[in-house]
Amino acid sequence: MRAAREVFSELGYDAATFQAIAIRADLTRPAINHYFSSKRVLYRDVVEQTNAKVIAAGIAKAREATTLLNRISAFFAAAMDAESTDRSAAAFLVTSVLEAQRHPELISEEHDALRSSREFVKWAVDEAIQRGELSTDTDIPAIVEMLVAVMWGMGFY
């Protein structure tokens, strides 16, 4: 999976091939084909696994915190932990957001990293308003999009 994640990140979905992934994984192309009937199936599995490793783990960690700043910080910390063990994870997530614009059929709603992170940030902002951290006249859509842009911008970095 790591080899596939790296190849998809470096080459993009269209240019990635089972052969390139097999070479990176030190396997044969038929070995990969045995487990994944198509590039789309492999890509979706990589998306699902990477989202669970980075986004879902970050959200779970952030839900333990009690303030907006601590929740966003916990999310970043969890993502950085995932990145420190597998440098391809964050790069792939950023690439997957771009690929979803080119190929909407590749991403299921359940495993859409951008949507999941946006929902998390909206929840965290709503909670911050309820707790009085942010004023009730806060422009929720604007602050959510700004925070999501910062999160994903850090992913590009």
Q: Which residues make up each language-model segment?
A:
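Solvent-exposed, amphipathic alpha-helical segments
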Residues: A3-E10, A57, K61, F92, ...
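Helix-turn-helix
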Residues: A3-V41, D45
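Short coil/turn segments at alpha/beta junctions that flank glycine-rich nucleotide-binding fingerprints
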Residues: E10-D14, A65, D86, R131
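Hydrophobic alpha-helical connector segments
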Residues: D45, A56-A89, T136, I140-L147
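Short, basic, alpha-helical segments at the C-terminal edge of helix-turn-helix-like DNA-binding modules
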Residues: E48-V54
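Amphipathic alpha-helical packing segments from all-alpha helical-bundle domains
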Residues: I55, T85-A91, P104-R131, P141-A142
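Amphipathic C-terminal alpha-helical segment
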Residues: A82-T85, T95, E99-R102, W123, ...
